[in-house]
Amino acid sequence: MNVSLFVTCLADIFYPGVGKDTVEVLERHGCNVKFPENQICCGQPAFNSGYHEDTKKAAKHTIETFADADYVVLPSGSCAAMLLEYKELFADDPEWEKRAEELASKTYELTQFLVRVLKVEDIGAVCHKKATYHTSCHMSRLLRETEAPFSLLEQVKGLELAPLANKESCCGFGGTFSVKMPAISEQMVEEKVGHIEATGADLLIGADCGCLMNIGGRIERNGKTIEVKHIAQVLNSKE
């Protein structure tokens, strides 16, 4: 099965290991992974800031870049959700709206793809940790995906998963929200970290690098030792 990886900006710049683990997990489950080198940002920062014409430029580039892909897989619910938003951008342009719909029909967040398309029942990972999982907003609200990550984490040998209170609440990142509303964002992430600490977990897992960067930064600033990992890293773990 041919899969094209949309690595995302944050994974590419700050978490390259997430991209590597994503590729290895997909390959382990029979995928031939391609990486289009001319891929760029999905356009979400511009979209969230109201620059819709600039977003359209990024969207057209992405649509053309992945036009021949069988499947497009992203290690990010947020960026995957943005690709699904493209068709709304081109509601007044039938040609590009159709092309956007074609891209959306083959776009999946990583855990979605593993569960919904590949039907993985044994992820083949080992992680002897007590962990808790942060559910990101865009993945749960826009992609409407809440089950796939837990389905896969339950297959990880040695992993003890502790429930997180108020798991549906935002961590305060929200892309440009954390820049525009820093005081509110700080209060939100502080509350999130408090709930994480209350689980007694020594590992926080999430599916979006933006959330993990925000929460991980607060954990470090608070002097705590909770490890923070993207779910791709856990699904590729052997320890």
UniProtKB/Swiss-Prot annotation:
PANTHER family recorded? LACTATE UTILIZATION PROTEIN A, UNCHARACTERIZED PROTEIN YKGE
One Pfam family named in its UniProt record: CCG
Annotated family = Belongs to the LutA/YkgE family.
**Coiled coil (UniProt feature):** none
One GO BP annotation of this record? lactate metabolic process
What's the stated role of this polypeptide?
Answer: Is involved in L-lactate degradation and allows cells to grow with lactate as the sole carbon source.
Encoding gene (name): lutA
The record lists the lineage as: Bacteria, Bacillati, Bacillota, Bacilli, Bacillales
State the Gene Ontology terms under molecular function. Answer: oxidoreductase activity
State the protein's name: Lactate utilization protein A
What organism does the record attribute this protein to?
A: Shouchella clausii (strain KSM-K16)
Any Gene Ontology CC annotation: cytosol
